[in-house]
Amino acid sequence: MKYCNVLDKEDVKNKTVEALRRAKETDREYGFNFCSADGKVIATYVEGGKKDSVGMDNVCPIGAKVIGALHIHTRPSLSRDAIPSPTDIKKSVVENMDFFCIGTNVNNQGIVRCFGKDDLVSDMVHILRKDRKDKLEKLGIKIEDIDRSIDRSTRLMVGRMTVYKDYLDRHSCQRIFVG
């Protein structure tokens, strides 16, 4: 999980803490992009959004390309853990990101969890499809739970994704920011 090291860079730590603080103060999502130029990873400025979306532009400095993104969830249904929503997964796939990070504030701690496209996204997309019963059974997940969640709203579906916590723990890295 080579992308985990990016969370330990001083400028990324500072921007992550800023995004966590601003999200907590305003109850709006905040985030930023990770860009790659000349073999270096840089973090863009922190952008603010709405209560349940950030709407970040896919922008980097001239000569750099977007390789990832980080944003902070504020909704109560996501506050138990930093778990990606189906929209987060879809966006990372469509925009061909190498990794993406989700954060949330819980008990005066900022939790940020990053996921790489190679070790999570393709598997998660398949898991969320009804026709992958064999893979679901291997993970000990009941197909009825998936059917129910697919037929309901995204918010309920995200709630059902907590079933995948063990799976997510094996396919992500996590950092705690005290604030």
Give the location of each predicted region.
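Active-site or metal-binding loop neighborhoods of secreted/extracellular toxin and effector enzymes
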Residues: 96-179
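Short HxH-centered metal-ligating active-site micro-motif
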Residues: 40-98, 105
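Glycine-rich short-loop/terminal segments
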Residues: 1-66, 141-179
